[in-house]
């Protein structure tokens, strides 16, 4: 879950492994995102916190009824929250790519940055991606890499598809993934 920041048990959804982002880095990313026309989404293990939600994103979240979110007015609302992922949301992907170009190099080195759904720039700690999480899960379950099939459709799935013994892209995959 969350690009590999969480590994949950299918039996009861308890957290098997969690990888959090540095709180200080999250604070800097939040302040940076405030300069742009983006909805900022901050994920903890069980709650999605949203700053500057727009109508389009609100409709999308309502469509996914299982998504519990809380609107926030500032980063201060996140005091004591263990942050596992952040996202900048804008429906213009070129705009998100421009934001990435303006990020300090040290952030790019500290982050695992990916894009998804033609609307999100996803920001995780550098140690996190779906491929690494799949490898950890395979080790926990004693499953050989060659016995794993991974299916994906977005840029954030690339590491998982590459790790698996058989990587599959769905028919409508982004071209650079397939």
Spans of model-derived segments:
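Zn-dependent metallopeptidase/amidohydrolase metal-coordination segment
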Residues: 171-172
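Conserved small/polar residues in nucleotide/adenosyl-binding loops
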Residues: 175-177
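Alpha-helical substrate-recognition element adjacent to the catalytic core
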Residues: 1-18, 22-24
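Conserved acidic, metal-coordinating active-site core of Asp-based
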Residues: 28, 32, 36-151, 155, ...
């Amino acid at each position: 879950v969350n690009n590999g920041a969480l590994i949950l048990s299918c039996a009861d959804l308890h957290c098997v492994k969690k990888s959090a982002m540095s709180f200080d880095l999250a604070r800097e990313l939040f302040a940076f995102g405030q300069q742009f026309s983006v909805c900022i989404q901050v994920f903890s293990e069980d709650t999605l916190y949203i700053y500057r939600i727009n109508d389009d994103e609100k409709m999308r979240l309502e469509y996914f009824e299982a998504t519990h979110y809380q609107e926030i007015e500032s980063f201060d609302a996140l005091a004591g929250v263990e942050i596992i992922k952040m996202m900048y949301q804008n429906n213009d992907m070129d705009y998100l790519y421009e934001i990435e170009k303006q990020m300090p190099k040290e952030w790019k080195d500290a982050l695992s940055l990916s894009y998804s759904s033609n609307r999100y720039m996803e920001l995780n700690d550098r140690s996190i991606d779906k491929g690494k999480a799949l490898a950890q899960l395979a080790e926990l379950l004693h499953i050989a890499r060659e016995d794993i099939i991974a299916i994906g459709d977005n840029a954030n799935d690339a590491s998982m598809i590459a790790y698996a013994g058989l990587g599959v892209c769905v028919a409508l995959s982004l071209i650079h993934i397939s």
